[in-house]
């Protein structure tokens, strides 16, 4: 086996021969990362990406200055979807090592699950993987129900059934109950709702290849909230939380839904489909109805929902929407504590009325007259949250996945958002 390359940290600048902008230098003993105190975690992550680019696949994090956050920053940049990498971790105290191990187990699960090809990961497989992950960290404190196919239609989950019926792989709703109290009557503290579209062709509003080639990742919201619940459990979550994953393929077939179809939801809302590529909100609506019925203190939904959020924020931030200023502030504080990028975008009462239909109460997409696509999508979802003005957060997961590598990240999933949501759940 190749000897490990030693990676050490220094607060001194690199030798002048490396240039004044050098963030790392190479010597006979290995590679030194030169921290400047401005953005040390980002510097470590970017350096790790460069080290991986050199073809170095076995490293040892050595010397002083390493902690769980710095080790994790290195791994975020070093990990990539192709090939294998080995890291020999530094000595950490028990709490720091446990934190690092939990991140490696759970957030790597999120990244690997999002990166999985759609042929391998259908709606049923996604739901089962989520059950397996949560059960692994919570054992006997978890119960769950999986509803699929025609049972969804019979039980009134019309959004999920409508979107998923065009695929040979049946749509699936996972309802998972994490109840550490052991009391079946214990109140539900929070509900997490995730969009789990395991492949999104756009349906009859078909995507171009350039927009479809990454759509195996359209279940990123479901993976993120699953990982968040698992991670919160490892951090000692002692309150009851329910997880709802709305899983389906959005494909074209003789049985697929069409423009002009009208969906009637269990809360009485009627929605006209005018864009089959705005399917995420249609499946999330079913999950939000179930979440509202639990009367929790908070509901958090996460979805790779709109291109508009990516237009606004790129792949660098998750977009946050809420009518509840206090709760939004708490999530942003959690994001700051976890060093994860979130940015709040506008959501106002008027966005709820910017989806007019001539044939139903709501249209599932905006129009040229109302171009704020990410905000109107959030406004659409609010119609399925019973008390939408309090206790509800919507996360449009624009930072979940990168089609191409950048200086800090390989191509593929990032795992961003897991720690922030877990932090909020355990605060």
Curated annotation (Swiss-Prot):
Q: Its domain of life? A: Bacteria
Q: Which reaction does it catalyse?
A: Release of an N-terminal amino acid, Xaa, from a peptide or arylamide. Xaa is preferably Glu or Asp but may be other amino acids, including Leu, Met, His, Cys and Gln
List UniProt keywords, sorted A-Z: Aminopeptidase, Cytoplasm, Hydrolase, Manganese, Metal-binding, Protease
Which parts of the sequence bind Mn(2+) 1? 200, 277, 279
EC main class here is hydrolase
Q: Name one GO cellular component term.
A: cytoplasm
User: What is any one GO biological process for this UniProt entry?
Assistant: proteolysis
| Gene Ontology terms, MF aspect | manganese ion binding; metalloaminopeptidase activity
Which sequence ranges form a coiled-coil region, renumbered to this chain? Answer: none
Tell me the InterPro entries matching this sequence.
Leucine_aapep/pepB (IPR011356), M17_PepB-like_N (IPR047620), Pept_M17_PepB (IPR008330), Peptidase_M17_C (IPR000819)
The listed locations are: Cytoplasm
For this chain's record, the cofactor binding note is: Binds 2 manganese ions per subunit.
Cite the EC number.
Answer: 3.4.11.23
Which residues constitute the signal peptide according to the record?
none
Name the positions where Mn(2+) 2 binds. Answer: 195, 200, 218, 279
Cofactors required: Mn(2+)
Active-site feature positions: 207, 281
Q: Which PANTHER family match?
A: LEUCINE AMINOPEPTIDASE-RELATED, PEPTIDASE B
**Entry's family note:** Belongs to the peptidase M17 family.
Assembly and interactions? Homohexamer.
Q: What is its biological role? A: Probably plays an important role in intracellular peptide degradation.
Q: What is this protein called?
A: Peptidase B
Q: Which organism is it from?
A: Escherichia coli O157:H7
Source gene? pepB
